[in-house]
Amino acid sequence: YKAGDADSSDDTRFGYTKENCWEAIRAALLFVENVERVPDMEDAEKKRLAAEAKVIVASRYFDLFRHFGGLPLIKETYDVQPSYELPRATVEETVNYMINLLDEAAATPQLPWDLGTDDTNWQGRFTKAAAMGLKCKILLFAASPLFNDNVPYCTEPPQDAVTNHQVWYGAYKPELWDQCLQACVDFFTELQSRGYYELTQATEATAKGYRDAYNKAYFTRENNKELLISTHISRFGKFNSWDEWQYIFVNSGNGTVITGGLTPTLEFMEMFPMSNGEPFQLNTATDLFYTDNDYNKPIRDPRLYETMLVNGTQFGDHAAELWIGGRDNINDTEKETGKYATGFGCYKFYKEGVNSLKDKYLQWPYLRLAEMYLIYAEALLKSKNDLPGAIEQVNKVRARVGLGDLAVCNPGKNLTTDADALLEEILRERACELGLEDVRLFDMTRYKREDLFRKQLHGLKIYRNDGGGNTPWSGSTGNSSIYPKPTKFTHEAFPLVNPSRAWWSNFSPKWYLSAFPPSE
């Protein structure tokens, strides 16, 4: 929302008619309606492709649903005609439509559980596992307080959508959590029987091994058995020989990363625990990221280094210098501008920029097995109040990167008895594991976390503590000939104000969802 409001000339964060959702839905429905007419295709292939098309419809409906709530339910294609209108369905009707499509797809014998080795060149196609997993993800969102509560998410006028149950169920329904849990049980029962999918594990129990495993889990397309659904950038033409990669996002002078659009905050950095799984404490930490600023001695959760660029990380031919005046951060943080405005940089999916991504086939995970374990954990907690069971599922995700037992690492939080505290840890774990994978914003909206939306965010100013001043150490302008490599730093948290977010001082719960265009 621009300047705290939205009007008919503005685009919301997800355009109702501008994200190719309806085009994809129509194309998929058109395929389902006509595939049987294809004369030279085997019947098994027809049924498989029709099932995949149904998953496409459900996935695109879900993309809209988590932004708008109840939607018009299109179940057939329309010919060109002067006008046609469909009413907006309730939240319950919209969820049921998506789930029925996924159930129909999963029940199709010709839809394979996995792509296997024979179909690895078809990465991105939907499978039975994808259909069952997406069902869990949809039910998790539907069961959450945004739609499933005794009070509507917004009480500001007009209230037509509230009265018509188009933005909530009308009351709290605990059975929705039961449905989510059952969907998870069904998925993992099938996984135990069918196999194939697994968390990408480290080949060696070292910091590098754990980081490499996480990198492969979210970043690698080929031979990735953790991916249930992957998506790719849709862009016409090529830039710099990048196949299906959005050049403007990465490298242009006004690109998103270059101008600081994805710059991590101090609050996000603090979510990542120490390398043993214990919470990170900024106020008592001597070193924040590496022992003595040596990138061969990391001390934090390996996922941190794959998610954000931090001071001291190996960065091309040198250790990243993100202190004020450093080689990589001459004045970004001081002026709160550019890709290091907060004292950190975006690393996940961006890596080291244009040269590191050149000629890569890149994908964003839409659903990974790691997320399935975290969905299962949340469903166990909310449906059965099974705290030990929930912790067990979270630990499977943490163990992949070498972190210890969640409850043992947080003895003061009483995670085996305090359900609210455990939920906070599950949401934090989701933020760390699934950062930049289109999850955190929706975790905040589905739990109606006005406190987090209003929370002032911070950056971190870093200063050399060796007498070398606000200057680079390495590179042509560095003073490495005079000073040894800096090992200690002074840190100063500062509020982010360039610009300040409108909702910090003027939040409205209506912003949990996006606005429909006035023409609709």
Give the role of each language-model region.
Residues A53, A58-R60, A130-P145:
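Amphipathic alpha-helical repeat scaffolds of TPR domains
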